[in-house]
Amino acid sequence: MNSIQLIIDIILILWILILTVLYFKRRQLNVDIVKNKKIIRAKRYIVFYVISEYKVKGDDLERVIRNSLKDLLGSVWLNIANPKVVTYREDTQEGIISTNRVGYKAVLASLPFAKEINNNKILIVPRRTTGSLKKAKKLIGLK
C-alpha cells in the first residue's frame, strides 16, 4: 500500500515539474526589478528632526542613517534607496534626507534603528515626506 502511494506521489511531482517547465519555457519570463526608470529618478525628501542631549553633526548623521538602513535591509536596499542628508541645521537639529520613490519607505523604516552617534543616544523623528526640495526647505524654515 505504501509503495503504491509513493509511486503515485512521484508521478504527480514529475507531472507538476513538467508542466512548470513547459509554462516557463513558453512565457520566457524576464523579471525586471523596476520596469519604469522614472520611478528610480523621482526624488522624495524626508523632513526630520533629531532629539538628543548634544549637538549632532550632519556627516555623522548621514553615516548613522546609512548604517541603520544597511543593518535593517542590507546593502542592496542601501544602493536602491541611496539616502543622503541634503540639508541639516545644527542649531534646530532639523534636516532633509534625499532618497528616491522606490526606497523612501525603507529609509523611514530604518530611522528608528539609528540610535547612537559617538556614544550619545539620539532619536531621529520624521516629520513629513514631500516630493519637492523647495517645500521641504520651507518646512524647516529655509528658503
UniProtKB/Swiss-Prot annotation:
Compartment(s) where it occurs, according to its Swiss-Prot or TrEMBL record: Cytoplasm
GO cellular component: cytoplasm; ribonuclease P complex
Protein name, per record: Ribonuclease P protein component 2
Function: Part of ribonuclease P, a protein complex that generates mature tRNA molecules by cleaving their 5'-ends.
Organism taxonomic ancestry: Archaea, Thermoproteota, Thermoprotei, Sulfolobales, Sulfolobaceae
E.C. code: 3.1.26.5
Gene: rnp2
SS bonds (residue pairs): none
Subunit architecture: Consists of a catalytic RNA component and at least 4-5 protein subunits.
Entry keyword Ribonucleoprotein: no
Catalysed reaction equations from the record: Endonucleolytic cleavage of RNA, removing 5'-extranucleotides from tRNA precursor
